[in-house]
């Protein structure tokens, strides 16, 4: 049997703020999860998304330190339409989360925006642009 992609794991230095960010994007994260050192949810399609707080990561990797610099990966959330990209970007930045690239019409045919979650991970918002007439 070949390995099957199953889980995206991320380390966080502020579980409560991180889970609030992803709840705002519609992920079904159980109430009270912010007090746990490990949280995971199953996304539509079966892939799991998990977060470990810094202490949990150091329990099996004592030399771990949070990365610095630009994000090493991004999670991309598809929005219903271009206006939703703008709305979600505004809602999240107004809630105090870091906007990185304001919404723009990308040359590849999508309305696109980039934020950073509380740990600096890239989070993209996108929607197909209407076809030009």
What are these regions (language model features)?
Residues 101-104:
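Active-site/ligand-binding-proximal alpha/beta "capping" segment
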Residues 107-110:
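Short, small/polar residue-rich loop motifs at catalytic or cofactor-binding pockets
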Residues 1-6, 11-33, 43-98, 116-133:
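Glyoxalase I/VOC metalloenzyme domain signal
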């Amino acid at each position: 049997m070949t390995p099957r992609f199953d889980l995206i794991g991320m380390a966080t230095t502020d579980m409560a703020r991180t889970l609030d960010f992803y709840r705002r994007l519609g992920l079904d994260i159980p109430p009270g999860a912010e007090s746990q050192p490990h949280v995971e949810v199953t996304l539509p399609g079966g892939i799991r998304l998990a977060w470990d707080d810094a202490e949990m990561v150091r329990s099996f990797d004592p030399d771990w330190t949070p990365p610095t610099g630009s994000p090493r990966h991004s999670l991309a959330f598809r929005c219903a339409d271009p206006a939703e990209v703008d709305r979600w970007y505004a809602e999240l930045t107004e809630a105090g989360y870091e906007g990185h690239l304001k919404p723009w019409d990308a040359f590849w045919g999508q309305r696109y925006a980039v934020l950073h979650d509380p740990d600096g991970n890239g989070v993209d918002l996108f929607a197909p642009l209407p076809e030009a007439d």
